[in-house]
Amino acid sequence: MICGLILSRLVGPGCEKGGRAFFPCDPYASPFPSIKGLQLHNAQLFVQNFQNPNTPYSRLLLNWQTGTGKSIAAIAIARQFMNHYMNFIENAPWIFVVGFTRTIIQTEMLRRPELGFVSYKEVAELHRLLHIAKQSGSTTSVESRHLNGFISTLKRRLTDRNRGGFFQFYGYKEFASKLFNITSKGEEKNFDVLSLFHRSDEAEDTLNENDISQFVQKISEAETNGLIRVNQKIMEQLRGGLLIADEIHNVYNIQERNNYGIALQYVLDAFPPHQAPRAVFMSATPVTGSVMEYVDLLNLLVPRHELPNGQPLQRQQLFDNSGHSVKWKKDALALVERLSIGRVSFLLDTNTNFYPERIFAGKMLSYRDEKLPYLHFIECPMSNYQLETLKQLGPDPKISSNAYSIYDMVFPNPKFSKQTEPKAYGLFNSTETPAALSMASTDWLLENGVQIIEPSRRTPFNVSGSFLSLQPPTHISGLAFYSGKYTQMMKDILSIIREGRGKILIYHNRVRMSGVLILQEILQSNGILNEVSSPVGTTRCSICAAIRDDHTHSDHQFIPVRFTILHSEIEPAVRERSLALFNASSNLEGHQLRILIGSKVIVEGLNFQAVRYEMIMSLPLDIPRLIQVFGRVVRKNSHMELPPNERNVTIYLYVSTTPDGGPELAKYAQKLKEYILIQEGDKALRKHAIDGFTNQIKIDKPMLESLPLSPSITPANVGATVLNTFEAYGYGEQEVKTISNIIISLFMARPVWTYSELWKAVSTPKLIQGITIDNKLFSEDNFALALISLCYSKNQCKELLIQNRLCTIMHVPAKPEHLYIAAVLNHKKEPVLDIETYIRDFQPPTMHSVRITKYLEHSQTKEPFQVLYEKFQKDFQDEPIEQVLIHYPASFHYTMLEALIIDNLAGMGALVEVYKKFFIAFSKKDIQPFPDIFKIISHVPGDDNTLVGYATEDSVRLITSRKDKTWHEIPLYMLNINVKRKENDIVIGYMESKGKALKFKIRPPIQVLKKNEITDIRMLNRGAVCETRGREEQQKIANQLGISLNLTKISAIKLCLLIRNNLLQKEMEARNQPNGMQDGIRWFYLFNDKMPSLVHTS
């Protein structure tokens, strides 16, 4: 009876694929699911089996397109070597992972239990800790520390030999510096490893191959002379080991002088061939900056003894560089083909089942009557003001590296009172523009809608203001005046938002001047918010792009458009949080974060999910890197959460043009010519790809990623397959694991199987999605082994998670054939088998977490505002009203300020005067000297003395509607408030929360702390409660402050009160001096002042 009920629920679609074994079928049931967990695809399986300890192949280049799983393939290869090294009794070699993206590889290893470095339970615990740490909202919380500790423990397992680790992870720079240690003698002589080599062309800064063949000998000579010390520990670890180098094109790129490639070349060539480490190199674009990099690539890829005459290749062997351009020599490409045989894996996967469709907006352009291949552009004619500025560079301008902004925009020029004057031109040079704008008068800045963003340690000089707006005030020239390109970008963004949902990635290679920082200001000037700002009347809706004041749509709620930004000057932890939020499934449509602006830090190693639009504002050095930028958003399975009709990415490639083409278009034309030469080398490199016969890549016409290509395949009679090494080399174990995953997936489809039915289903090709190998070749012996390993026995319960149920597979003897039933487990982890087995949905008790630290903080320090308000009214009937600033926490003051502004509390005139005296609260009269800002609050009812805003530690909040309780935030500097006023030379006072109390603390001024050399971080004076200071120190401070009482008869508590009140009085006086909030001396930090960070930097 039980079996009859269960068998009646067999899966519908897909039944017939397996033959009669799958009848009867329920026509309404779901199809068989995809196999769960990580499954290596064919290309990954092939290279894993090709490059392993049991094959003779020493070096391999994974030339796979971006997003196809190079890192997983490299880890799979490394796992085979690790399994082999574990059999060594002593002196086992190491696996070195070197590259700028090594943390990405570590992350993959720790989030994929199928790779064998972590268990499923550890991954579940990692996800749990990640969730809790994210809820804490702080990278320094207890929860975040627990997460970091857990991750560190897992990482140590990879690198600690005592814990079974076989890996070493290095950045390229770190690896080179640790391999080549400059001695003190070498430092005295300013020795540089690169000095061992001459330069063939100083302008290109590339190595001379006439000397490169002797570099091992030269390094040995330098070591003998005491200039350098080669790290023998690293050399011994690499002897017979494995070297994985990610993004290999970075080690020999001519754009930047480095010794990364020399370090790799040295460790590969310093050993006899049979002791040299194996090597796996990875890159979607192995040659980038110059076609001549092929020489460096082949010298790394081909062992020395297999190169012509046993010597490194030289550039003159492959290239003719006699004229104005580089050309391939005759037979050079044939040599590349021959040398790359057996050493290159090529993968270009365009399967639309897994990858989003790539769509180019715009049109193809020509430069000087030559059509530019491959790329479509959004043509952006320069504005007249840009053209006038370009004329300053002459008739055929050569754009220097500090003049790159001319490609994008120009800035207002203080040389001209009005930018619309005849012959007026703008600024664009990165060395001149910041100085010129910084020295401009306040009147000129206001007249031209420019606001200076003062630089800080992590924020370089930048500008904002209405000159970046599409709709500026009538007397100000707006964005269209200064940039045709950015005007078009802004119009396209608004059009995309109006047309529907979809996330946008904006790329610019630069950070400063016309780079990502100004893009951030352009978005904000046109109604798009950053991650944290509150909406105001001009904020745009993420659904219809209307501004909030005009938002009349009844079919949807107003949701502000928001953006985030990633660049090298943002803390890594902040970048990771922003990226996680942008990629989150909850942000699929972009209503939490619609736009991400990224600099060149996003070109390699980062993945973006479900991006529908990519806007490229500048060329990233060369075309191969442009391909890398495309690959950030076109990745395998990157759009699987979107509906099928939305699995595409539209790419906007913006270029500024002039009537005769322009310098930016000329740059693209030159780089595309260079890229054609690189493509010819790529074609030769890939012709004999080791997996060409399995991937069956055939490219009929030129495309961005490849010239026409047909793999060179020579049919051969290989005879019968030799199976006697199948088990010995571990392939049988891999097959058992694969079959186990298939069996679990089948039990997700139906809970009861007979042995023959199950074997039939397992061996049926394409029955379950995600299996790329030929099921018909499975061994039934391995199937039986997999089934037994999953089945319940009384001695050991095999727990499985099937359809969200904690299950086991029960083996039930029956006639005529035994049954295998997926039975749920009860709380004792015993299988339950009855008539409801197939529908019972048992789940273990859900765990709930409480943030203890947050609870304690709230319960100990927060009192209801009403309680504090009543206490305030009672305490300050007779006390000096200024004392309110130091007796109540920031939460009370901010609530009070908003109540004063919104509700106009009666009887609070004295408190309002205190807030105004310390420049904490602002009336309409206070804002009137700033016309651009006054426009924001001019419509707010009330006379000149009406409060309209208050200062926080980061900004000034201005009321825009008392009824709706909406605010507009502006930077502090816009009201001439300098957050970094110079501290006095005596002592600094401030209040700090201790439980429900506020304690008065003092510390030395920051300039004194900087002068003192502190060798022990524990000795860094971060401040202390005044009463805990020594009596002598208290009296010294009081004397320096001019407190003229008889201090010997005053208690420590009274003395500290005198010091506190004195500092508060001096702070008020300093603020009320002319320009006091800009240049006044700092004595006391109030509740809304940001304290400088005190960290030990030595």
UniProtKB/Swiss-Prot annotation:
Ranges where the Helicase C-terminal domain occurs: 489-689
Localization per Swiss-Prot or TrEMBL: Virion
GO molecular function, one term: ATP binding
EC nos: 3.6.4.13
GO cellular component terms, A-Z: virion component
Keyword RNA-binding recorded: no
Reaction(s) this enzyme catalyzes, per UniProt: ATP + H2O = ADP + phosphate + H(+)
KW Nucleotide-binding (keyword) present: yes
Top-level class of the enzyme under EC nomenclature: hydrolase
Motif (DEAH box): 246-249
Family statement drawn from the similarity comment of this UniProt entry: Belongs to the DEAD box helicase family. DEAH subfamily.
Function recorded in the entry: Putative initation factor.
Name of the protein in question: Early transcription factor large subunit homolog
